[in-house]
Regions:
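Glycine-rich phosphate-binding loop signature in dinucleotide/nucleotide-binding domains
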Residues: 46-49, 131-138
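Generic beta-sheet signal
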Residues: 4, 137-145
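Acidic, His/Gly-rich catalytic cores of divalent-metal-dependent hydrolytic chemistry
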Residues: 187-195
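Short active-site segment of divalent metal-dependent hydrolases/proteases
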Residues: 12, 147-148
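Short beta-strand scaffold positions
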Residues: 55-56, 122, 142-143
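Phosphate-handling substructures
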Residues: 14, 28-29, 70-126, 165, ...
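Active-site-proximal alpha-helix that buttresses catalytic centers in soluble enzyme cores
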Residues: 2-3, 7-72, 115
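Domain-level recognition of soluble alpha/beta enzyme cores
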Residues: 158-187
Length: 195
């Protein structure tokens, strides 16, 4: 059986500030508590033989991966298709501003200067399919809240990518077998399809 362990990056400085970051060139480090939580997750996963660790282009995901894997020799690869949503002109704004923009717009509306939630959803579905096409038995995926939320909700058969799972905690593992991740990719794609 193949296993995919999806986890959101550990607590970052922008999590503390309640601000959003959708640009991987903006450095956002982990907090001390975030590094400790990632190290704890690494300890919790130590009995698993990880074959691969995937992270996004965002430094906070790589830093989380390195803390989790400390002392282990596991291949690290970057998967840009799992990058956080490009929020364009909302970069650095508050979570409240981001949520207000979302409430006032459709999923198909791109953020000013960025991408739409549907665009990101289709990108995440492609990323999960790429992971499924690989041969590793146990893969750790360190990414962001939105792709994990979408995967959980789509795999559960929800008609919304944003519910019932809504907030994904940092540095918490979510386990998917091959069939469940494939169902998630199919569901995300179906719910992100252009109208």
């Amino acid at each position: 059986m193949r296993l995919f362990i999806l986890t959101r990056h550990a607590h970052s400085t922008l999590n503390v500030e309640g601000r959003i970051n959708g640009d991987p060139s903006v450095p956002v480090p982990l907090t001390d508590a975030g590094r400790a939580a990632a190290a704890l997750l690494g300890h919790q996963l130590s009995a698993l033989g990880l074959d691969l660790c995937v992270h996004t282009r965002f430094p906070r995901t790589r830093e989380t991966a390195e803390c989790i894997l400390q002392g282990r020799h596991v291949a690290l690869i970057e998967e840009r298709l799992l990058d956080d949503i490009d929020v364009g002109d909302l970069e650095g704004d508050t979570i409240a501003d981001y949520r207000a923009w979302k409430r006032a717009h459709l999923r198909s509306d791109p953020f000013p200067g960025g991408e739409s939630l549907d665009d990101a959803g289709r990108r995440y579905a492609r990323a999960f399919r790429r992971l499924l096409d690989r041969d590793e038995t146990v893969t750790l995926v360190v990414c962001h809240e939105i792709p994990i939320r979408y995967a959980l909700n789509a795999a559960a058969g929800s008609d919304s990518l944003d519910a019932p799972a809504h907030e994904i905690p940092n540095a918490t593992p979510f386990l998917f077998d091959e069939e469940t991740l494939a169902r998630a990719a199919d569901g995300i794609e179906a719910l992100s399809r252009p109208s």
